[in-house]
Regions:
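N-terminal intrinsically disordered, low-complexity, charge/repeat-rich segments that act as generic
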Residues: 1-60
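Short amphipathic beta-strand and strand-loop transition segments with alternating hydrophobic
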Residues: 2-9, 76-81, 134
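A short, compositionally biased
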Residues: 14, 84-86, 112-116
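Short beta-strand micro-motifs in enzyme catalytic cores
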Residues: 16-18, 89, 127
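A structural detector for beta-sheet-dominated domains
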Residues: 21-23, 40-42, 67-69, 80, ...
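Glycine-rich loops and low-complexity Gly/Arg-rich segments
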Residues: 45-48, 63-68, 114-116
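Short beta-strand/loop turn elements enriched in aromatics
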Residues: 57-103
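Short, compact, well-ordered microdomains
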Residues: 92-137
Length: 137
């Protein structure tokens, strides 16, 4: 497992390692496996992120943002109150909160299944990523 990812010995069976890769977009007409994210998160039987399990294992809910150049950024998957659905998911790399977060657009509604698409707001731009793997931890 990559540096910065949690130890898995004590995690519930619902935890998964999820790999997202950049889908087709302007500038990347074929998508790109070099741009993406690896998430460690609990999934319910509906393949959505399980917010209740997140509460009791929040430190284990991690994200690694990878790019073709530069170091990987390691952070946390954060669930915050607010938004139109009452709560939303963020990817936070600076736990002190000095840097801006990346928002997982409608992550609470997304099914993390191979072939599905999810959107992440990076700075002021929305990017779409394809779920390419979901593995038990």
């Amino acid at each position: 497992m990559r540096e910065g990812m949690p130890q898995v010995a004590k995690l519930p069976r619902a935890f998964r390692k999820i790999r997202l890769e950049l889908a087709r977009e302007k500038g990347h007409p074929a998508g790109s496996s070099g741009y993406g994210y690896t998430l460690v998160a609990p999934l319910g039987s509906d393949q959505k992120i399980d917010a209740d399990l997140w509460i009791s294992h929040r430190d284990a809910c991690r994200v690694v943002r990878f790019r073709p150049t530069g170091d990987d950024e390691v952070g946390h998957l954060i669930h915050q109150p607010g938004g139109s659905s009452g709560a939303f998911w963020l990817l936070r790399y600076d736990i002190r909160g000095e840097d801006s977060d990346e928002a997982g657009y409608r992550f609470q509604d997304e099914h993390f299944e191979i072939g599905e698409y999810v959107s992440i707001r990076e700075s002021d731009t929305m990017h779409t990523y394809r779920v390419v793997s979901v593995e038990p931890i």
